[in-house]
């Protein structure tokens, strides 16, 4: 099955825009910022922007990697914008966010892979928004833990790193990323005493048994929060959808994950990494 096959009813969404959506878009555009909501064609953008929330993407909008599931543009990135951390922090203040989520493209072209830019952004958000909690969804930094430490030392409240898929499928869809390296990054975050989180997509051909094995692998790292959502093929050039997972199976995954020991499991067809993230800080 490919994503050109008609989607099931449970995947149909309403993108309707309201005044809050329009204002969120105005703030993002006026500060020349990027969001994973738009670059990743997130199905929840209408809902989240309509509530005045967005996931900011730093480091530009061009990624040095070319994962087969991701819609973000790939190629040679532009130099970092030194004003971006302040612009992100100012936008968060204008949006009056209680909880901010930040992610980034991979910047394998930079000596520090973008780690100091990450840390600077977190510090600027804290400076202008001292009451706002911060969640960051970071790349693997090529498994260089001293770079992960730069992010940890800036003291975000939650650090997330996505496994994306089960071990068998990981090399088929992840560019320059490694299943075990990702586990090591999450383990390092957990050992530092930071609340850790990860997310996966299903519908890529994995089995329920493989998903449960991935859960066990994550729990062994100390990961506390897991998100599970349906993979949707961004274009014909991307990896095809193998199956549309039923809402019942998503419910089963949530039940199994909680029984195994995760503190929080968000599992539904339209769940994405930052969906309802404000609830995860509690």
Question: Could you say what each language-model-derived stretch is?
Answer:
Residues 36-48, 61-74:
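Local cysteine-cluster metal-coordination motifs and their immediate loop/turn environment
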Residues 38, 59, 103, 137, ...:
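A secondary-structure boundary/capping signal
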Residues 66, 110, 169, 236, ...:
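Glycine/Thr-rich phosphate-binding loops of Rossmann-like dinucleotide-binding domains
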Residues 63, 106-109, 141, 205, ...:
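Short, glycine/serine-rich, charged loops/turns that create anion-binding
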Residues 1-55, 86, 90, 96, ...:
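Auxiliary Fe-S-binding modules of radical SAM enzymes
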Residues 72-87, 94-145, 152-184, 197, ...:
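Core AdoMet radical
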Residues 61-64, 97, 164-166, 231-233:
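Short connector loops/turns at beta-strand edges and beta->alpha or beta->beta junctions
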């Amino acid at each position: 099955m490919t994503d050109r096959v008609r989607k099931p009813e449970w995947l149909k969404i309403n993108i309707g825009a309201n005044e809050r959506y329009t204002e969120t878009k105005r703030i993002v555009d006026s500060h020349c910022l990027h969001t994973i909501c738009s670059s990743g064609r997130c199905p929840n953008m209408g809902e989240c922007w309509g509530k005045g929330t967005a996931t900011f993407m730093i480091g530009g909008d061009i990624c040095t990697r070319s994962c087969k599931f991701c819609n973000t543009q790939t190629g040679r990135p532009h130099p970092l914008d030194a004003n971006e951390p302040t612009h992100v922090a100012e936008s968060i203040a204008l949006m009056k966010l209680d909880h901010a989520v930040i992610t980034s493209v991979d910047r394998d072209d930079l000596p520090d892979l973008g780690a100091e830019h990450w840390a600077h952004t977190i510090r600027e958000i804290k400076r202008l928004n001292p009451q706002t909690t911060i969640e960051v969804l970071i790349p693997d930094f090529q498994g260089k833990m001293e770079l992960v430490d730069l992010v940890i030392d800036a003291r975000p409240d939650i650090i997330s790193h996505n496994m994306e898929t089960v071990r068998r499928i990981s090399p088929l869809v992840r560019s320059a990323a490694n299943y075990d390296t990702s586990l090591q990054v999450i383990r390092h975050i957990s050992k530092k005493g930071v609340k850790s989180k990860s997310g996966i997509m299903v519908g890529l051909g994995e089995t329920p048994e493989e998903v449960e094995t991935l859960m066990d692998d994550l729990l062994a790292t100390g990961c506390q929060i897991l998100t599970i959502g349906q993979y949707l093929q961004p274009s014909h050039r991307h990896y095809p959808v193998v199956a549309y997972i039923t809402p019942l199976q998503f419910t089963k995954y949530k039940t199994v994950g909680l029984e195994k020991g995760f503190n929080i499991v968000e599992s539904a067809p339209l769940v994405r990494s930052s969906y309802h993230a404000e609830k995860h800080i509690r």
